[in-house]
Design a protein with these regions (language model features):
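Membrane-aqueous junction of the first/signal-anchor transmembrane helix
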Residues: 1-176
Length: 176
């Protein structure tokens, strides 16, 4: 009879340990790691092709990957945004000049969310590729920016809508 009582006690202890581990996992998954939070890895790949005369075609691939195990959505109805901007950098800058990513003359702008119908759903582990082509004058330096913004539905400390954002940028030379 003693062996049965010990086995019963061990089984109850293991069951309790499993419940505690499951509770810890659920707490971590939903509280600490932010299961409702979003993350998106954005990369830019560019290619310059000949076009007409001194014009070139800048082909831009905006690649997005949702690395998280849950989906998230961008919705224009909630004032979310997913934009691509191309800016011409000043050719006569002096040494030591720092160009900020959103500095320069705006050449082109594309609303990637609008082009997707106003609603963009990123499934878990999904990878997307949005391609845009822009005609640019040869012998030009441009900065390319892809920016994603999501309204969280809350307000910040100043009473303004709280916005999470993610962006990436690169600089491209358009050769002669």
């Amino acid at each position: 009879m003693k062996k049965i009582e010990i086995a019963d006690f061990v089984i109850r202890l293991l069951t309790l340990a499993a419940l505690v581990c499951g509770g810890f996992w659920a707490w971590y998954q939903y509280s600490e790691s932010g299961s409702t939070d979003w993350q998106n890895n954005i990369t830019l790949k560019t290619e310059v092709l000949p076009y007409l005369g001194d014009m070139r075609l800048l082909v831009i691939h905006v690649q997005s990957k949702n690395p998280r195990p849950n989906k998230f959505e961008l919705q224009s109805a909630k004032h979310d945004s997913f934009e691509l901007r191309v800016r011409r950098l000043k050719p006569d800058a002096v040494e030591g000049k720092v160009f900020h990513e959103d500095e320069g003359d705006l050449i082109a702008q594309a609303d990637l969310l609008k082009l997707a119908g106003g609603d963009y759903e990123f499934l878990p582990q999904a990878e997307m590729d949005d391609m845009q082509a822009v005609v640019v004058k040869a012998n030009t330096w441009v900065s390319v920016i892809a920016e994603m913004k999501i309204h969280t539905g809350t307000r910040d400390a100043h009473g303004q809508p709280d916005i999470d954002e993610n962006s990436t940028s690169t600089v491209v030379y358009i050769p002669k």
